[in-house]
């Protein structure tokens, strides 16, 4: 059987060739009609008014059935709907679809602000964004699991939610579940205490998309890891999409079961690095437009230069500046932004950062000791962390070069300068190093 449009065109041509139908009648009744669908041998046809429907019913149905049979060898029955009725049906369907989507979104705990439309793409997240889009188009096929890793406030959660929203937009019936690793753990514990493990399994294994945030917190939780392993297996074997986030690669998560590490690496792991200056400016501009606030480009650049750690701090700074402008009843300028960040103590947490704090964070991050950082060992696994610690000490504290050298076991100030310059230069071309430094800055400037 031809598709309904081809069939309609053939039927319409037959009416046009019918000697018993005048051109005026053809133009008034047939030409103005429009096919909508063909299901179960019923062709739904849209007509201009109830008058047109009555005319078709009284004068044209028999010939329609005859012409349709000529082309299909089947009995096709027309069903007419007026223009107004069609619009009403469309509006009702649209409202129902939106209602279903809203209900689905509420059930999934997705944040309505975190969509692909509101995500600002930059060099540090370009690949992650592309992978997220690909997974949205073909869930469970290309990259499963999809594993985002990087420091806090860089957009991992945003992309995760965007995937969920996109799948629901594609099909409102998609079963999406977003959960933090902590919430998953709590649900699991509660299910055991209340003897509701079957309900727990139904909740997490009967979905099309599972989004789990901050899986590094599964570390040290043996029973939870065991449960998540079986949840992962059930979804993966059913070709359901899994998306995970962490602050580090799977194999860098301490005390994570080897079989989970292995499965987390089955798909695609992508790091998200701190945004560069251009991306930070774009993020601020996007937020200003969303908030309908006018901010000069030079002011946006000033803010972007002040905050270089993560998106969360950028948005926090923007919120502070807008609030300050309202209090002052003044337009936002660079001077006002400077006053706002100073008067609201933005960035004052830097004054609390000390060299010992930096040494402690760096040592834990790279799994070395503070003594190693202060010592003279020349292994690469120690030299790089030592140079990063010196770089951060100069970047995040007001300490003099000699003071920094003293804190690192009596190093000469030229050694500190060399370390700072080396790391600064490498940051421009080494994405992994940029991610590591960004992670440490985020931890030091919560």
From Swiss-Prot:
Region listing for Domain IV, binds dsDNA, in residue ranges: 326-446
Location of the region described as Domain II in the Swiss-Prot/TrEMBL record: 74-108
Region annotated Domain I, interacts with DnaA modulators, chain positions: 1-74
Alphabetized InterPro entries for the sequence: AAA+_ATPase (IPR003593), Chromosome_initiator_DnaA (IPR001957), Chromosome_initiator_DnaA-like (IPR020591), Chromosome_initiator_DnaA_CS (IPR018312), DnaA_C (IPR013159), DnaA_dom (IPR013317), DnaA_N_sf (IPR038454), P-loop_NTPase (IPR027417)
Claim: Ubl conjugation is one of the keywords in the record: no
Keywords: ATP-binding, Cytoplasm, DNA replication, DNA-binding, Lipid-binding, Nucleotide-binding
Subunit annotation: Oligomerizes as a right-handed, spiral filament on DNA at oriC.
Record's protein name: Chromosomal replication initiator protein DnaA
Organism: Pediococcus pentosaceus (strain ATCC 25745 / CCUG 21536 / LMG 10740 / 183-1w)
Taxon lineage: Bacteria, Bacillati, Bacillota, Bacilli, Lactobacillales
């Amino acid at each position: 059987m031809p598709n309904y449009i081809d069939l309609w065109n053939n039927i319409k041509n037959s009416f046009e060739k019918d000697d018993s139908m005048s051109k005026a009648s053809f133009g008034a009744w047939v030409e103005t009609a429009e096919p909508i669908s063909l299901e179960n041998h019923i062709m739904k046809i849209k007509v201009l008014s109830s008058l047109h429907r009555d005319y078709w019913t009284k004068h044209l149905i028999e010939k329609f059935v005859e012409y349709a049979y000529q082309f299909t060898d089947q009995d096709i029955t027309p069903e007419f709907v007026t223009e107004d009725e069609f619009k009403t049906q469309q509006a009702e369907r649209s409202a129902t679809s939106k209602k279903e989507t809203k209900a689905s979104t509420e059930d999934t705990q997705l944040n309505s602000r975190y969509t692909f439309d509101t995500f600002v793409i930059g060099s540090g997240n370009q690949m992650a964004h592309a992978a997220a889009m690909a997974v949205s188009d073909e869930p469970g096929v290309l990259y499963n699991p999809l594993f985002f890793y990087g420091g806090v406030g860089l957009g991992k959660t945003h992309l995760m939610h965007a995937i969920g929203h996109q799948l629901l937009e594609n099909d409102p019936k998609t079963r999406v579940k977003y959960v933090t690793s902590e919430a998953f753990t709590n649900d699991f514990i509660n299910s055991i205490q209340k003897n509701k493990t079957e309900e727990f399994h139904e909740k997490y294994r009967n979905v099309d998309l599972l989004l789990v945030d901050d899986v590094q917190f599964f570390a040290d939780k043996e029973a939870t890891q065991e449960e998540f392993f079986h949840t992962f297996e059930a979804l993966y074997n059913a070709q359901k999409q899994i998306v995970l986030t962490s602050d580090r690669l799977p194999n860098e998560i301490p005390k994570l079961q080897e079989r989970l590490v292995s499965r987390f690496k089955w798909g695609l792991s992508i790091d998200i690095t701190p945004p560069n200056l251009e991306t930070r400016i774009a993020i601020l501009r996007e937020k200003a437009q969303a908030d309908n606030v006018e901010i000069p480009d030079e002011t946006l650049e000033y803010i972007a230069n002040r905050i270089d750690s993560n998106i969360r701090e950028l948005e926090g700074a923007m919120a502070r500046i807008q609030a300050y402008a309202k209090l002052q009843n003044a337009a936002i300028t660079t001077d006002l932004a400077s006053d706002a960040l100073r008067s609201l103590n933005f960035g004052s947490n830097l004054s609390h950062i000390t060299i010992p704090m930096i040494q402690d964070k760096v040592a834990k991050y790279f799994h070395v000791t503070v003594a190693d950082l202060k010592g003279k060992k020349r292994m690469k696994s120690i030299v790089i962390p030592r140079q990063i610690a010196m770089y951060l000490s100069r970047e995040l504290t007001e300490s003099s070069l000699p003071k920094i050298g003293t804190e690192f076991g009596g190093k000469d100030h030229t050694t500190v300068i060399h370390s700072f310059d080396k790391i600064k230069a490498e940051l421009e071309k080494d994405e992994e190093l940029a991610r590591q430094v960004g992670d440490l800055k985020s931890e030091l400037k919560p």
